[in-house]
């Protein structure tokens, strides 16, 4: 990190103000060049100066000064607040680059903050989650990850693995000492199995509540022409899907997202499930079946003005082990032909969907919010690493059960240990760190 980086930190659009961020050892020297005035690290924390291109003034800006280590990145850092035209902002950026800085990579400012111990990896990931949050709930969870950055869960896992590695290596290096406690295969298996169980639980917890970050996938299924597209349009209050009396008009999956009291719901209207000789329609039906498997919640829509038929009973059987709500459409006709089925009555045509919205809210488990607030994993990046750790430990556990000597298994433990250290920000493996920060914003 001996070079100086720069990037536009605000959207590259015409606006009132733009911010250009510069960080690194030559920050003050570079800004002094483009202002034709020495910008010192002492004095006021912000100054008003002109930016020059040769001898021509191109903008009057506010310069915010941060001196290492008291900055976001832990380095000398300056933020130039200029007028927000795209042309002028990029002109100033070009001047900074010509004066010795290089364009930052995605997430490089945050990566430097992490490498300079200004942030934990958990805090860095939570900041990225916060930037991309689409609901109040996701924002609150991300903020919680920034504030509560402890690594207690991973510290416990790390220490257990380190303890095992240490005992095995002592046994290998000093077999002649009888007073050194010997690690048995039974002890090894118990310890590793305990770690595997803990990792499985935290992965399951993350998967259970990931919808709070990414949104709940709500799939609308039913026979053709029962009002699925009308229901979708009523829920999202737009005319998104094709509404027609012709069967099979929704041949592909139609997706729209809404913010329901702080929770993101991704509604998917699917092709009607029926026997069809139309190849294109059959593709849509296959996609519907795939969506059902991935759905967090299924809205099974029926026409309640007539009894459900054989095909609808097959659909009901298909989703019986999923999280679903039976939605009885056409309540305005007041027939209620399927009174034996427990469901929510609505009229998609009259946009009377409030009872369904209330049921969806009730369907969400309050306990999930408690799990989310105490998650050990806070990002997909961490999830990927934990899965890698789990894979290595499962391999080691299986090999131990098969009779492998422990000295052959210690290398697997070292791999797992290093990956846990990566999550905690203790790893020197910069390749992994680079990959994690590539998903961040430019200028962040």
From Swiss-Prot:
What EC designation does it have?
A: 3.6.-.-
Please give the name of this protein: tRNA modification GTPase MnmE
Query: Could you list the residue ranges forming a coiled coil in this record?
Result: none
At the highest ranks, the source species' classification is: Bacteria, Bacillati, Mycoplasmatota, Mycoplasmoidales, Mycoplasmoidaceae
The cross-references to InterPro entries, in alphabetical order and at most eight, read: G_TrmE, GTP-bd, GTP-bd_TrmE_N, GTPase_MnmE, MnmE_dom2, MnmE_helical, P-loop_NTPase, Small_GTP-bd
Query: Which Pfam family name is an example for this entry?
Result: MMR_HSR1
Q: Which Gene Ontology cellular-component terms appear in the entry?
A: cytosol
The record lists the organism as Malacoplasma penetrans (strain HF-2)
- The UniProt record lists the TrmE-type G domain at 215-365
């Amino acid at each position: 990190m001996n070079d100086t980086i720069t990037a536009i930190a605000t959207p590259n659009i015409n606006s009132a103000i733009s911010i250009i961020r510069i960080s690194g050892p030559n920050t003050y020297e570079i800004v002094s060049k483009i202002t034709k005035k020495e910008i010192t690290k002492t004095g006021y924390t912000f100054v008003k100066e002109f930016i020059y291109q040769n001898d021509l003034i191109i903008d009057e800006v506010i310069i915010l000064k941060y001196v290492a280590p008291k900055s976001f990145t832990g380095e000398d850092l300056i933020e130039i607040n200029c007028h927000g035209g795209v042309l002028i902002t990029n002109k100033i950026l070009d001047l900074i680059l010509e004066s010795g800085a290089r364009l930052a990579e995605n997430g490089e400012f945050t990566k430097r903050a992490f490498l300079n111990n200004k942030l934990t990896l958990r805090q860095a990931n939570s900041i990225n989650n916060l930037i991309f949050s689409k609901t109040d709930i996701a924002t609150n969870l991300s903020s919680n990850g920034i504030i509560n950055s402890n690594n207690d869960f991973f510290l416990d896992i790390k220490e257990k693995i380190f303890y095992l590695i240490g005992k095995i290596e002592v046994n290998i290096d000093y077999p002649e000492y009888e007073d050194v406690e010997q690690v048995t295969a039974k002890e090894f298996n118990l310890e590793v199995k305990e770690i595997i169980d803990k990792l499985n639980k935290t992965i399951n917890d993350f998967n259970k509540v990931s919808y709070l970050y990414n949104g709940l996938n709500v799939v609308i299924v039913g026979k053709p022409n029962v009002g699925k597209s009308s229901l979708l349009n009523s829920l999202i209050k737009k005319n998104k899907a094709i509404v027609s009396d012709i069967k099979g008009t929704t041949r592909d999956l139609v997706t729209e997202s809404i913010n329901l009291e702080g929770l993101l719901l991704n509604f998917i209207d699917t092709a009607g499930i029926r026997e069809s000789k139309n190849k294109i329609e059959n593709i849509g039906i296959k996609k519907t079946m795939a969506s059902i498997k991935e759905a967090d919640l299924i809205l099974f829509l029926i026409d309640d003005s007539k009894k459900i038929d054989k095909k609808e009973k097959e659909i009901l059987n298909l989703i019986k082990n999923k999280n679903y709500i039976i939605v009885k459409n056409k309540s305005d006709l007041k027939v209620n032909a399927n009174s034996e089925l427990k469901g929510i009555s609505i009229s998609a045509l009259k946009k009377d969907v409030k009872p369904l919205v209330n049921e969806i809210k009730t369907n969400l488990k309050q306990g999930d919010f408690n799990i989310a607030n105490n998650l050990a994993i806070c990002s997909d990046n961490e999830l990927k690493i934990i899965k890698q750790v789990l894979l290595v430990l499962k391999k080691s556990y299986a090999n131990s059960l098969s009779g492998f000597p422990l000295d052959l298994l210690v290398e697997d433990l070292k791999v797992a240990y290093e990956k846990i250290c990566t999550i905690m920000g203790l790893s020197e493996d910069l390749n992994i760190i680079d990959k994690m920060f590539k998903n961040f914003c430019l200028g962040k």
